[in-house]
Regions:
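A detector of single, family-specific signature residues
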Residues: 1-183
């Protein structure tokens, strides 16, 4: 099954016209194609409502100004986390989302593991997916000899020390901390 509305629509349109598809199945394919169109209209309506909310909300405007954050990330953060005052610091917000390393301690020894993955998985996914283009843009700026800002420089230094995905999670963690400060 293809991912994406346009690919699914094209696949169903081809299947309807295909002689190998039984005649009994074609009305069901028409119904599925209509459901895809209806869902796309509903998604557009929800995105329009979110855009209207973001225009009126000063917090959403500030959150959307953070590199890597867009309409969905800003509104999901406001809906999920509520107010910044619920958290003592940016670290607590990032920890609540599940972006901080899991700590294992025994006696005087402490080790850090992978991210804890606690909290809202949708918000965490949006932040990590927002961090990936930020990292890619930093790499492209280096290739074209353009200057880097502080966050991009830090992201590239981090990527040199670890894998791309770990760097994206660490950037998402930093984005959550920046969001708390801007909120």
């Amino acid at each position: 099954m293809p991912e994406g509305v346009n690919k699914a629509r094209a696949m169903f349109a081809e299947s309807i016209d295909d002689d190998a598809v039984p005649q009994m199945l074609r009305p069901a394919l028409h119904t599925l194609l209509q459901e895809i169109d209806d869902l796309e209209v509903k998604v557009d309506a929800v995105e329009h409502q979110l855009a209207g909310f973001a225009k009126q909300s000063p917090s959403a405007k500030r959150l959307m100004g953070i590199p890597g954050n867009g309409l969905l990330t800003a509104t999901a953060m406001l809906a999920s986390a509520g107010k910044a005052s619920y958290f003592r610091s940016g670290h607590h917000l990032a920890s609540w989302i599940g972006l901080t390393p899991r700590e294992h301690s025994s006696g005087s020894r402490g080790t850090l593991g992978g991210i804890s993955k606690r909290g809202d998985p949708y918000l965490r996914m949006l932040l990590v997916h927002g961090a990936r283009p930020l990292l890619r843009a930093a790499n492209q700026r280096v290739k074209s000899d353009r200057p880097l800002d502080t966050l991009q420089r830090w992201a590239l230094q981090l990527q040199e020390r670890t894998t791309h995905n770990k760097a994206a999670c660490a950037i998402a963690d930093k984005m959550a901390r920046i969001a708390w400060a801007c909120w």
